[in-house]
Amino acid sequence: MHRGSPRLWFETNRLGSAGLLPGSRFDVVALEHGIKLVPNAHGQYGVCSKERNGRQLPVIDINSREVLAPLGEQQVVRVVVRLDAIFVLRVASEQAKAERIERLRTKLATGEQLASASIAHGAGVLSNVAHAGFKEAGIELDMKVLCEIDAAYVEQSLNCNPVSANATPLCAPIQELVQDEWLMRQVPRVEVLEMGLPCSGASRAGKSKRGLSMMEDHPEVGHLIHAALVLIQKLQPAAIVLENVEDYRVSASAQILRSQLRDMGYQVREHVLRARDFGSLENRVRWALVATTDGLPVVESVSPQGSEPGITLGALLDAVDTDAPCWSSMEYLKSKEARDLAEGKGFAMQLVDANSTSVPTIRKAYNKGGSTDPYVRHPTDARLMRKLTPAEHARIKGVPETLISGMSATAAHEVLGQGVVCAPFRALFAELARCFKRLRDHGPVWIGECASAHRLNGTIG
C-alpha cells in the first residue's frame, strides 16, 4: 500500500532473469491468488529504468487497484522469478488462511458435514464430546482421521465410539507419522481439530516422578509439540482445540504453539475449565487452548452451567450388594496413611458415599489403588470401602458408558482418567460451533495480516 492505494514496485536486476529489461514490455495476467508478469514485445506495460552506481536498473511500477486486486491488498507478497515470467503471490500464511475460511464457509452454506480430526485420540472421549457439542449447536461433524499410538485404544474407539465410524486410524507415534512422506500426502484437510497431547511431563506428579526440570525434558513426550504442529500444517483446520493439564500452559511447548499458530493466521484464546462450574461432581480442572482462523469469531468465554440442585454421588453409583467381594478394609492403605501422617507428608485417603456432592479427581492409574484416590465408603460398615467401578467413573465424568464397553477395569480407568469431564468441553465445542454459524450468517471479520507478514513488512520497510 502507498498512501492508501495498492502499489507494486520492483527495482532490481533480478527482473532481467525473466527477460524484463529496461525498455521491454509485459502483460499482467490475473491468477487466483496473485498475478503473473509475462514478457510480451507488444505488452500493455513497460519496464522503466533507474541509474544506480553507474548501472541501469530495471524498474516496474504498477499502481492499478483493479490489476492488483488478486493480491487482496496484502502488505507483503511472495515473488517468484522464473525465466518465462514473474509470479507475485500472497504469502503462504495469508493464502492458507483465506483457503481455510473459504472452505469452511462453503460447507456451512451448503449444510455439508464438517470434517474433523483427532490427535492423541485415546479411545475418543474428547472426539465424542466435540461431536456432541457441535450437534447441540446444529452442526454435524464427520471425523476423517484419528492419530493414536495405542492399538488397543484405536480398536476400542473403532468398535464402540460412534464418531469414529468413518475415520481412518493412524496407529503410530505422531513423531513417526510426520516423517512418513507417503502417509502425509494422504492426510486430508479438515475444519475442526481436537487434540489432547500427553501430559506426563507437564503434570506436577509426572515432573516429580521423573525429576524433570521442565516438561520438554520428558524423553518420550516432551517434544511432541513439533509433530503436532507438522500435522496442523498438513490438516489446515479452521479451528483447533487442545486440552491438557493446567500446568501445560506455562511450558515452552505451549509458548511455541501460541507463537506458531499466530504466525499461521490463527487467533488464540485460552480457558481454564473447572468441571465443578459445569455441574460435575469431580473436581477436575483442565486448560484449553482454542485457535480460530482469522475471519472467524473467537471463543472469548465458555459459560458455566450450575449443577443440578441436590445432585449427589448416589445417583451415579451402581447398586452394589453390601456383602459383595469388592468391599475391603484396605488395611495396606490405612497403614500407609498412618505412616504418611507420622512423617508429616499430609497424604490421606479420600472417602465418598451416596451423599457426597463432590468427588476428588480420578486419575489414569486409579485401578492400582493409590493412597489418595477416592474410595466409596460402605453404607453400614465403617471399616470397609471399595473402588469406583469403571461405569461409575464414566458417569461421574459424563462419558457415555458405551465408550468403555468390554474394557478391563484397568484399561477403562486409564481411558477415563486421562480424558476430560464432558460438560465443560461440550459447552466449549458448542460455543465454537456458534462462532462458525456467525461466520456463516455474517461473513468473515478480518483482523489483518498474519503476524509473520507484519514482521516481514517491518523488516523490508
Where are the predicted features?
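Class I S-adenosyl-L-methionine
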Residues: 180-190, 202-368, 458-459
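C-terminal target-recognition/interaction regions appended to catalytic cores
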Residues: 4-6, 14, 23-103, 336-461
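Core alpha/beta nucleotide-donor-binding catalytic domains of modification enzymes
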Residues: 105-236, 246-249
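Short polybasic/polar patches that bind polyanions
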Residues: 16, 135, 159, 262, ...
